[in-house]
Amino acid sequence: MIIENNPATKQQHDDWRLRIKAEFSDTDFSVSSDYLCLIHYLDKAPQKFYSREAFKQYLTFLESVKLTDPKLLADILIEAEPLLSVSNRILTEVNDKPIHDTFLPKEHNDLINFIDKEIHYNLLKIYETPFFYLSKIIANYHWIKTKKATDGLDLYNSVEQLKKVGFGFVDKFYLHDVRNGIAHGKVIFTDVDITYIDKKGGKANIPTRKIIDTLDGILDIANGFCLAFKVFSLTNSDFFETYGIQIPQSILLEELQAKANGPAWTITNCLESVAMQDKKQLMIYVKNDNWDYSKVHWYSFTTAM
């Protein structure tokens, strides 16, 4: 493809592909060259600290079920696609926040203010969107196989199901009482710990700094799950095409950015829309700092390709 031969980025992209293949040596990348967005899990923090256990277990599940129950897996992924796209976008937003690998406030009052403003809010976002909807794919499959109605498959039940099928490591970082206290109840700070009270009066006491470790841990797991889903979706094009599964739009945007971004040219978003006569179109938003019209023309063409 022309876009892959952009002289400004070709050497870098070739290097990325070599490094990605080396990092995920058990994966066959021969079916497509569209996997450059995975470089974030090698170079960017906190993505590069993803849970290796979560990644391996999740990818093993997807590959296994693709062989044993392809139609059921396809149905689950088709239904989940819009929320998986939102989940990936929210996970990226939390990953990009300047709250990771930073010095914590030394004064206790400053620390609990940081926890209240940054940790609790982002912990709840991770629990309720990327962690939940990525976990729900696995739980949904097992509930359907055991003929359980999936209407009641909420976050708590999804986690309980995961713990039964080899994902027990999530129990350390999914704290249900903490989640309920932040979302629906009350949070009380003391000099040594934090008390989370849910709407029914249940309480959980957590050491102050442990809640920061909890965010780090659940973020690493969510990143591991999301990475596994990206590897699976970007290397199983035949399966996706056969069953009409759409790769979540936010993942496609990441791949487009990884491939088409260049010096003074940054893709910021893309949206599907309907033009006159009900014709579908894709609007791509770009931040351009080029003054040379020929460069703008080149990048516009290669981005559209």
Task: Enumerate the predicted regions with their spans.
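Extended charged low-complexity segments that act as oligomerization/scaffolding linkers
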Residues: 1, 163-165, 238, 251
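Amphipathic, heptad-repeat alpha-helices with coiled-coil/zipper character that mediate oligomerization
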Residues: 86, 129-136, 177-188
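Short, charged/polar, low-complexity loop and linker segments
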Residues: 106-109, 154-164, 201
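Short, contiguous, well-structured surface segments enriched in hydrophobic/aromatic residues
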Residues: 113-161
